[in-house]
Every structure is written in structure tokens, then in C-alpha cells.
């Protein structure tokens, strides 16, 4: 029989690209330090949302202003995680501007 390989897939999302890259580097460094193999970080497509609003409160339909928000995403796969890897990832403090989703397979 084949041995079942364990894998942890971590998806990170954030508006600030620098903060996201630092968080990803922290996760990769923590996983490598505990002896797990790491695939990534893989940059996923950036979602760009543009909002257009009128500048004036009453008239002047031609005068508009546009705002945009970009959501950057990264993917990290941790292959063959040990118990130390999972404990170290639980103790890792990430900034508030980074959303993290962890899926074990």
C-alpha cells in the first residue's frame, strides 16, 4: 500500500503586499526550521476592485473620482509536517492585516 502523504495548504490574503510577503516569509522560515518541506510561496492573481463616486454632492455628473483596492494572495504548501511544525505555526504571531486560511489534506 502507498503511504499517505500529509500536506498543509496555507492561503494568505491582504491589502498590503509588503506585510503579506513578510508574513509568508515568516511561515516558510518557521516550517523549514522545524524540518518540513515547503513549496512556495506561490503568488496568486491579485484582485482589483475599482469604485467610482461623484465628487460633488449634488450636480456635475462629469466630475468623478475613482478609488481602488487590491487584494494580494499567496499560497504556501507544507509537505510532511511534523508535530513541531504544527506547534510552531500555532505560536506564530501574524499581523492583523493578513487573513490566513489553513487546510490540512
From Swiss-Prot:
Gene Ontology CC: one annotated term: ribosome
Pfam families: Ribosomal_S10
PROSITE patterns in the cross-refs: RIBOSOMAL_S10
Record text on subunit structure and interactions: Part of the 30S ribosomal subunit.
Biological processes annotated in GO: translation
Record's function text: Involved in the binding of tRNA to the ribosomes.
Protein keywords: Ribonucleoprotein, Ribosomal protein
SUPFAM superfamilies linked: Ribosomal protein S10
Domain of life: Bacteria
Keyword Ribosomal protein attached: yes
Taxonomic classification: Bacteria, Pseudomonadati, Chlamydiota, Chlamydiia, Chlamydiales
Name of this chain's protein: Small ribosomal subunit protein uS10
Amino acid at each position: 500500500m502507498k503511504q499517505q502523504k500529509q500536506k498543509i495548504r496555507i492561503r494568505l490574503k491582504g491589502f498590503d503586499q509588503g506585510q503579506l510577503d513578510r508574513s509568508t516569509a515568516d511561515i516558510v522560515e518557521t516550517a523549514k526550521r522545524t524540518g518540513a518541506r515547503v513549496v512556495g510561496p506561490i503568488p496568486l492573481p491579485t484582485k482589483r476592485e475599482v469604485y467610482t463616486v461623484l465628487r460633488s454632492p449634488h450636480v456635475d455628473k462629469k466630475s468623478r473620482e475613482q478609488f481602488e483596492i487590491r487584494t494580494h494572495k499567496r499560497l504556501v504548501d507544507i509537505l510532511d509536517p511534523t508535530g513541531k511544525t504544527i506547534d510552531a505555526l500555532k505560536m506564530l504571531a501574524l499581523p492583523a492585516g493578513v487573513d490566513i486560511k489553513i487546510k490540512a489534506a
